[in-house]
């Protein structure tokens, strides 16, 4: 699909909220249901992996290493999709990322507890693709699957809003606060694990499907606006062309009249 407008639909506020809700749900499901492993917060996994390594507990250190490895592979996959499909006109590459993420998380809902390492790995893989592919909201960088960066950026913009009395900085700070709030609400969905068990991750699938559809609708509206603008510009160009043709005809008429006057003067000179 063509990208002709300044603000892409993937950077809109509704899409950001849906992605953060999904990110919070993913983390809650992996932590409460899958051996207390973080799907998104790889820093926590690395800390625990290091602690178990020092304790010479190889089994548990591997348990926390695998999500980190899958996360790294997920980033590479998102980069590959972006590289291969960013110039295609049929579908936006981010739609492909969302499609793959939805499929993976849907599969995770069927994986039994005996294969928690695989479930956590696939969830981390999907999370990495999401955080790599959706990195800005209204021109500001953010993360849809973790909060520390959003908290830091939000407080930075809030400080500037207070000290410099800038409303735009306050609005940006509010966007980061919204990101953290939506992630928290998504994480609260972890309470539903008592009712739906491993299927709770499908809440994340539903949120991502809504995100996918919202991006499609906004893309269609965006293309219609672009086409309308192009038609208007074409009419303006046609109008300008007609005016130029009129000016050219007028100049030709004036030139012809001047030539006629010169011819008359030549005849008078010859006559004298």
Where does each model-flagged region fall?
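The feature captures the hydrophobic core positions of alpha-helical coiled-coils
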Residues: 234-237, 241-244, 248-251, 255-258, ...
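Alpha-helical transmembrane segments of multi-pass membrane proteins
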Residues: 2-235, 264, 270-272
């Amino acid at each position: 699909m063509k990208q002709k407008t300044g603000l892409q639909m993937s950077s809109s506020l509704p899409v950001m909220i849906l992605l953060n809700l999904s990110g919070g749900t993913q983390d809650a499901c992996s932590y409460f249901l899958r051996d207390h492993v973080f799907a998104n917060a790889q820093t926590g996994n690395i800390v625990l992996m290091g602690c178990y390594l020092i304790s010479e507990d190889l089994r548990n250190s591997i348990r926390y290493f695998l999500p980190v490895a899958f996360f790294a592979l997920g980033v590479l996959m998102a980069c590959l999709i972006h590289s291969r499909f960013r110039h295609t006109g049929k579908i936006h590459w981010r739609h492909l990322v969302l499609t793959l993420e939805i499929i993976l998380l849907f599969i995770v809902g069927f994986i039994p507890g005996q294969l928690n390492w695989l479930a956590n790995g696939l969830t981390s893989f999907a999370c990495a693709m999401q955080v790599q592919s959706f990195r800005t909201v209204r021109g500001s960088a953010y993360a849809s699957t973790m909060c520390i960066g959003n908290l830091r950026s939000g407080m930075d913009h809030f400080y500037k809003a207070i000290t410099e009395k800038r409303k735009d900085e306050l609005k940006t700070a509010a966007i980061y606060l919204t990101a953290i709030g939506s992630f928290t609400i998504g994480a609260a969905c972890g309470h539903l694990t008592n009712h739906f068990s491993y299927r709770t991750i499908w809440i994340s699938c539903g949120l991502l499907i809504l995100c996918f559809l919202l991006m499609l609708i906004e893309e269609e509206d965006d293309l219609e606006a672009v086409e309308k603008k192009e038609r208007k510009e074409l009419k303006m160009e046609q109008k300008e062309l007609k005016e130029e043709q009129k000016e050219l005809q007028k100049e030709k008429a004036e030139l012809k009249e001047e030539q006629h006057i010169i011819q008359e003067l030549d005849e008078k000179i010859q006559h004298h």
